[in-house]
């Protein structure tokens, strides 16, 4: 059970960092190319 908790915390932390970097830069590729 502890392995599940540690993997969940690791994935959630990586997801938060990824979204922070993604939303910091303007996503011009997704918005301009419709």
Swiss-Prot record:
Signal peptide: none
Compartment(s) where it occurs, according to its Swiss-Prot or TrEMBL record: Plastid, Chloroplast thylakoid membrane
Keyword Plastid: yes
UniProt keywords, alphabetically: Chloroplast, Membrane, Photosynthesis, Photosystem II, Plastid, Thylakoid, Transmembrane, Transmembrane helix
Any GO BP annotation: photosynthesis
Single GO cellular component term: photosystem II reaction center
Membrane-spanning parts: 3-23
Superkingdom as given in the UniProt entry: Eukaryota
Pfam families named among the record's database cross-references: PsbT
InterPro entries associated with the record: PSII_PsbT (IPR001743), PSII_PsbT_sf (IPR037268)
Entry membrane topology: Single-pass membrane protein
Subunit-level organization: PSII is composed of 1 copy each of membrane proteins PsbA, PsbB, PsbC, PsbD, PsbE, PsbF, PsbH, PsbI, PsbJ, PsbK, PsbL, PsbM, PsbT, PsbY, PsbZ, Psb30/Ycf12, at least 3 peripheral proteins of the oxygen-evolving complex and a large number of cofactors. It forms dimeric complexes.
Function, as annotated: Found at the monomer-monomer interface of the photosystem II (PS II) dimer, plays a role in assembly and dimerization of PSII. PSII is a light-driven water plastoquinone oxidoreductase, using light energy to abstract electrons from H(2)O, generating a proton gradient subsequently used for ATP formation.
Protein family (similarity comment): Belongs to the PsbT family.
Name of the protein this chain belongs to: Photosystem II reaction center protein T
Source organism: Solanum lycopersicum
């Amino acid at each position: 059970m502890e392995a599940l908790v540690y993997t969940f915390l690791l994935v959630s932390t990586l997801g938060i960092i990824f979204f922070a970097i993604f939303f910091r830069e303007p996503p011009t590729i997704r918005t301009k190319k419709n």
